[in-house]
């Protein structure tokens, strides 16, 4: 049985709660000693993992809608993407303010050079910023065919973000490997599209170099 528009509306409400409740828990944990011995790292990892969860959920929607024959599920994709961006922004903010400190934000440039995994994280965030800014129907109409080309960069984020996570942890544990494995699986479901995008990009680069 296919989902109705009303059911999708209620699903959106549930997804908004799924985005908000972790934030409420984090606030509670900060104020009631619910974090570990290194609360700054705990906050950074929690916000980063939550952003990754919403990224994976966003990537899951299209194949799920296709294979489950639930076309209206696509309506939840933008919502999940915006929550991914929100949590990624919290992740970046927690690093900038809690790790570096307000008075040391100028060090961010140096950190990006000395810690390459931060560069991957910043690139991912900038892409998510662009996708969030252009996620409205008005921007979709304005950009035309370029809109889809821009939003295909979410696949690059799906590659860079798990690498950023794996690279940032001192000891490799199962958790970042699971996130990376899920990202690979979700990308593999799109291998035909990704191969087509790669071949198109290679052709464009070849044509420019041949001029």
UniProtKB/Swiss-Prot annotation:
It is found in: Cell inner membrane. The gene is msrQ. GO terms for biological process: protein repair. The keyword Cell membrane applies. The chain crosses the membrane at residues 10-30, 82-102, 116-136, 153-173, 178-198. One of its GO terms (cellular component) is plasma membrane. Binds 1 FMN per subunit. PANTHER family: PROTEIN-METHIONINE-SULFOXIDE REDUCTASE HEME-BINDING SUBUNIT MSRQ. It is a multi-pass membrane protein. Its cofactor is FMN; heme b. Its main location: membrane. Belongs to the MsrQ family. GO terms for molecular function: electron transfer activity; FMN binding; heme binding; metal ion binding; oxidoreductase activity, acting on diphenols and related substances as donors. This is Protein-methionine-sulfoxide reductase heme-binding subunit MsrQ. Keywords: Cell inner membrane, Cell membrane, Electron transport, Flavoprotein, FMN, Heme, Iron, Membrane, Metal-binding, Transmembrane, Transmembrane helix, Transport. Part of the MsrPQ system that repairs oxidized periplasmic proteins containing methionine sulfoxide residues (Met-O), using respiratory chain electrons. Thus protects these proteins from oxidative-stress damage caused by reactive species of oxygen and chlorine generated by the host defense mechanisms. MsrPQ is essential for the maintenance of envelope integrity under bleach stress, rescuing a wide series of structurally unrelated periplasmic proteins from methionine oxidation, including the primary periplasmic chaperone SurA and the lipoprotein Pal. Heterodimer of a catalytic subunit (MsrP) and a heme-binding subunit (MsrQ).
């Amino acid at each position: 049985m296919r989902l109705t528009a009303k059911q999708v509306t209620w699903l959106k409400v549930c997804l908004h709660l799924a985005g908000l409740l972790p934030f409420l828990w984090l606030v509670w944990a900060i104020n009631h000693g619910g974090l570990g011995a290194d609360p700054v790292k705990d906050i950074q990892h929690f916000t980063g993992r939550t952003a990754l969860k919403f990224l994976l959920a966003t990537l899951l929607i299209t194949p799920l809608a296709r294979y489950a024959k639930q076309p209206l599920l696509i309506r939840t994709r933008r919502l999940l993407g915006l929550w991914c961006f929100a949590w990624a922004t919290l992740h970046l903010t927690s690093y900038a303010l809690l790790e570096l400190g307000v008075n040391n934000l100028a060090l961010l440039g140096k950190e990006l050079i000395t810690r390459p995994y931060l560069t991957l994280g910043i690139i991912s965030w900038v892409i998510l910023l662009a996708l969030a800014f252009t996620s409205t129907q008005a921007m979709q109409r304005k950009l035309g065919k370029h809109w889809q080309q821009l939003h295909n960069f979410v696949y690059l984020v799906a590659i860079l973000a798990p690498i950023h996570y794996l690279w940032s942890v001192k000891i490799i544990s199962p958790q970042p490997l699971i996130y990376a494995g899920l990202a690979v699986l979700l990308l593999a479901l799109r291998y035909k599209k990704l191969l087509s995008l790669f071949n198109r990009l290679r052709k464009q680069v070849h044509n420019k170099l041949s001029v």
